[in-house]
From Swiss-Prot:
The gene is darP. Belongs to the DarP family. It comes from the Bacteria. GO terms for molecular function: ribosome binding; rRNA binding. Member of a network of 50S ribosomal subunit biogenesis factors which assembles along the 30S-50S interface, preventing incorrect 23S rRNA structures from forming. Promotes peptidyl transferase center (PTC) maturation. This is Dual-action ribosomal maturation protein DarP. GO terms for biological process: assembly of large subunit precursor of preribosome. The lineage of its organism: Bacteria, Pseudomonadati, Pseudomonadota, Gammaproteobacteria, Pasteurellales. Pfam families: DarP (PF04751). HAMAP family: DarP (MF_00765). It comes from Glaesserella parasuis serovar 5 (strain SH0165) (Haemophilus parasuis). It is found in: Cytoplasm. The keyword RNA-binding applies. The keyword Repeat does not apply.
Length: 177
């Protein structure tokens, strides 16, 4: 019987499950980790402190934030390499939470703009449901702002009260949330 070489794989062994990973898949994973590293570099120090990363990775990210151009690119490569050695899923989840908080704030501001436009178009009929939903709103102050914004719109004046309605809604509703 021929002697089995040390590096040769025994294809008859059924107990061992061999998972083949293509070179392209390895490259895609490495590219994904580099993008994750680049996203971490863009975070400010407060958000970076919330990330579940070790000290070596944190120092590499802080160094990359100070570097420019080619040195930064090489540092991102290095951060990607460090990310290959750690479980990157908790880091990705924490990053998604930080980015999603920004998206939630943008959605809230967009909602406030729609509420403001609806208030100006419909007047008093739109105030009651809004005050029911947000009881901290001052109904009389809101009516005065809406009336002034409607007059500005008819007279083609600059939208001072239009912006003031938005600021009032923003300060009151965000404070309540």
């Amino acid at each position: 019987m021929a002697k089995k070489q040390r590096n040769e794989i025994d294809w008859t062994d059924e107990e061992e499950e061999i998972i083949w990973v293509s070179k392209s898949e390895i490259k895609r994973d490495a590219e994904h980790l580099k993008k994750l590293g680049a996203s971490l570099i863009e975070l400010n120090s407060a958000n970076l402190a919330k990330m579940p990363i070790d000290d070596t990775l944190r120092e590499a990210i802080e160094l990359a934030q100070r570097l420019r151009l080619e040195a930064r690119r090489r540092q991102i490569q290095y951060i990607g390499k460090l990310l290959r050695n750690v479980d990157h899923e908790p880091i990705q989840e924490a990053l998604d939470k930080v980015e999603n908080r920004h998206n939630q704030q943008q959605a809230l501001l967009h909602k406030l703009e729609l509420i403001r436009d609806e208030l100006i178009e419909q007047g008093d009929s739109a105030i009651n449901p809004l005050v029911d939903e947000y009881p901290t709103l001052d109904r009389q102050h809101l009516r005065n702002l809406i009336r002034a914004a409607q007059k500005e719109k008819q007279a083609n004046k600059p939208p001072k009260n239009y912006r003031e309605i938005f600021q009032y809604l923003k300060s009151t509703i965000i404070e309540q949330n």
